[in-house]
A protein has these predicted regions:
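A short acidic, glycine-rich active-site loop
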Residues: 48-59, 98-104, 178-188
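Short, conserved clusters of charged catalytic residues that mark active-site
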Residues: 7, 59-60, 130, 143, ...
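Active-site lining segments that contact anionic ligands and/or coordinate catalytic metals
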Residues: 19-21, 70-75, 136, 145, ...
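His/Asp/Glu-enriched, well-ordered alpha-helical/loop segment
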Residues: 48, 75-76, 82-161
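C-terminal cap of metal-dependent C-N hydrolases
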Residues: 90, 94, 150-192
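Glycine/Thr-rich phosphate-binding loops of Rossmann-like dinucleotide-binding domains
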Residues: 9, 32, 84-86, 167
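Short, glycine-/Ser/Thr-/acidic-enriched flexible segments
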Residues: 5, 29, 81-83, 161-164
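Histidine/acidic residue-rich metal-binding segments in metalloenzymes
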Residues: 1-76
Length: 192
């Protein structure tokens, strides 16, 4: 379940305490962007950020980070739905026709590392759990995936926290003509 607000997180936490098999995944966008993005006077800028659920008030972010730390939220996703600006314009006269979703797949790991690990919101182990181990467990492919043990698939990334870059539409690999993380300075990139 995509989790964008503290009320959803709390419902998931209570359900898990009762033994229900339910999982929560805040999107990297929900951890780092907020509903002020929709107040931009440039219609295209705001429309590019339309997704479901929407960005929420910044007040919800601390609770989502805490959920990742505590394990009541399990993974960080992106809901990568690469709708271009022209596609988003389908809703120029009717908000309900704006295709929901935005990019984020390419940026997820670096933004999570920079805004999570480097700020002390997540440990390195919590980062690995939220990006690899937990999803493998949820999908019942652990320990073949999501672990470094003998006999497991060798799906690894060499992560270098010393490689920095500024996120930009000019250099990203996505087909999108915008990037919701435009201008973010991030540290840590896959080396291999």
């Amino acid at each position: 379940v995509h989790v964008s607000c503290e009320q959803s997180h709390e419902a998931i936490r209570r359900a898990r305490q009762k033994g229900m098999r339910v999982f929560g995944e805040p999107l990297i966008q929900f951890l780092t962007l907020d509903d002020s993005e929709y107040l931009n006077k440039d219609w295209e800028y705001a429309a590019r950020r339309v997704m479901s659920p929407p960005f929420r008030d910044k007040i919800h972010q601390d609770g989502l980070w805490a959920g990742l730390q505590a394990g009541s939220l399990q993974v960080v996703a992106t809901d990568h739905a690469a709708f271009t600006t022209d596609q988003k314009k389908m809703g120029v006269d009717n908000f309900t026709l704006i295709p929901n979703g935005t990019g984020g797949l390419e940026e997820r790991m670096s933004v999570l590392w920079t805004k999570g690990v480097e700020t002390g919101r997540l440990t390195r182990n919590e980062f690995v759990a939220a990006t690899s181990t937990n999803i493998a467990k949820i999908l019942n492919v652990y320990p073949r995936k999501g672990s470094l043990v003998e006999g497991a698939d060798a799906d690894i990334v060499v992560w270098d926290p010393k490689i920095s870059k500024t996120i930009s539409v000019a250099s990203h690999k996505s087909v999108l003509d915008y990037n919701v993380f435009e201008g973010f300075q991030v540290n840590a990139q896959p080396r291999y």
